[in-house]
Amino acid sequence: MDDNSLKEYKTKLGNLSVNDKKMRDLYLRKLALGEIQGPPTGYASIDKPWLKHYSEDQILKDFEPMSVYQLMYNRNIEHDNEVAIEYFGNKITYGNLLKKIDLTAKSLLELGVKKGDVVLISMPNTPEAEYLFYAVNKIGAVANCIDPRSGIESFNDEINNFNIKFYFGVDVIYDKIKNISSDIKIINISVFDSMPIVIKQIAKLKNKEPIIDSRTIKWNDFLKLGKKSTINSIKAEYEANKLSAIVHTGGTTGTPKGVMLTNEEMNGLIYQMMYGYSEFKRGQKFLNFMPTFIALGLNNSTHLSACFGLHSVMIPSFEPEDMPELLLKYKPNIFLCGPMHLPIIMRNEKVKKADLSFLEIICSGGEKLPLNIQESFQQFLKEHNAPANMWIGYGATETSAGIACMKNNCFKFESVGVPYLKNNISLYDTELEEEIRGYNKSGEIRINAPTIMNGYSGKNANETDDVISIDEFNNKWYHTGDIGHLSEDGLIYIDGRIKQIIMRKAFKIYPQIIEKIILKHPAVKSCAVVGVSDEEEFRIPVANIVLKPNFLGNKEIEKSVIDYVDNIINDELPEYCSMAGYNFLEKLPLTPIGKVDFKSLEKIGIINGKKRKLVKSKFSIN
């Protein structure tokens, strides 16, 4: 298909009605399954080979526009007695959850919060955080969720950006927060407020409450406003394409940005999960430790859990080392995790002896899951009677946390799964700025989806156009910045990030290729290859390696790893891929949300300060 024919064909597709697009998707599904014959174009965004993994009924589903509160309400109004939240043993039913949200909504109105106001919320994972999110949404206001660990400057930026008048936050940061603008009403919330009485009393004896000023009120006093209210009922507010929440990016390669999400964008992910994944069932127990100030926590954990009618076990404070104990204590059917959690689980002596048949869905996300860990954990699950497969998911804050995920009917190691039901994917050559034709060819992953953000907020607003483009048919495309490829079956594979590509002189080095080599050494626990500035070569690759505990500090093992990597590069890769330096660390630095902090690693440089010479390889460029 030449350029003119392709353009004409795309124009024809762009002018199809909504119903005609569905009919075409059914045709593409049959084409991908081999049920009918026809000439595919070779362009992923046109052929959509991933549709073979969805049923005809799923493809024909529509999304009903409504607020996030209304969707959650509709899904649970007839399930009053089922458990919605478990918090330190205190179980809150869906009936009580809806009542708590109503009371919170009345209290917000009595406090003076109005439709369209932005409310600043800085909370760990507690029931109050969930009540607030849905109550704020119910009255037509916007929840701006910010990490409690943020500096006071970040809080003031949000206050100034949105003219915020109301702040709800955890009391342990009150000494910091009391210095914000004097015009702000502060509501202090304790992580103990929803604990069972005995646990609450013990916890309060061990922890002093902060002394508050006159403009600050406690959560329970705030709720008294709603109890005294003369408002009988509150109609759920909904207006198309209005903001529902602001969450913040993880800041792995820069400072966190505020991401504005609408009701449609947040619900878009939930609808796609509801219609595309039969593995989720009402009443399943979900281990919920992702914080609500990130999209993965607010949308893909809290909102998803409530809309699916799951039994959400809320964990307000979490360290990776806690995972084995939490698994054995609560026996969840579902949990989301990061790659760092899996080795900790496999090493734990109690878990090694446990029956894990309760585990039905496990999904790793946030960053790439090394193949050796995925294979090991899949085998570990099998040996411990768990029916779950080790899924990998793929998303971004800018897409309401979701782009793609594995399904049990298309499970493949290293793949991050198939695009969600209504998503479209294209692979782009960023130098030629054109879509790549064919499969298993690397390019930038771009996504058209109902979940793409409204835009960045505040001082980052002008960066929105850097990552979102609008095509000639008014379709919004998010440029992920990830390099990946698509298989003929429509499965996505991540090869790296554009920002992490290392330009050494005129040559591109993809860090994940080197990281795969390093991780194959039996003494290596984890690693990250980063580019470090260099006057002669622009950027040079440096490997940061963490050895397994019994090898830490062993110089002979360190040398064996270096020799191993050098030899493979010499045999299999061009010489410009040879490492300019090796750093052996006790652990990799992490961002506040647990991702590898590449900026910190770049600043470390080469610890001994000695840049290694190029290792001459069989593919020498000189």
Describe every region a protein language model picked out:
Residues 81-112, 117-126, 130-134, 151-156, ...:
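Conserved AMP-binding/adenylate-forming core of the ANL superfamily
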Residues 93-95, 235, 244-271:
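Conserved AMP-binding A3 loop
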Residues 129, 150, 167-169, 335, ...:
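AMP-binding/adenylate-forming catalytic core of the ANL superfamily
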Residues 140, 267-285, 293-336, 344-349:
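Conserved AMP-binding/adenylation subdomain of ANL enzymes
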Residues 209-248, 255, 279-285:
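Conserved pre-ATP/AMP-binding loop-to-beta segment of ANL
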Residues 333-337, 346-413, 424:
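Gly/Ser/Thr-rich phosphate-binding loop
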Residues 418-422, 433-470, 507-509:
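Conserved ATP/PPi-binding loop(s) of AMP-dependent carboxylate-activating enzymes
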Residues 502, 528-533, 542-546, 565-622:
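Conserved C-terminal "lid"/linker of ANL adenylate-forming enzymes
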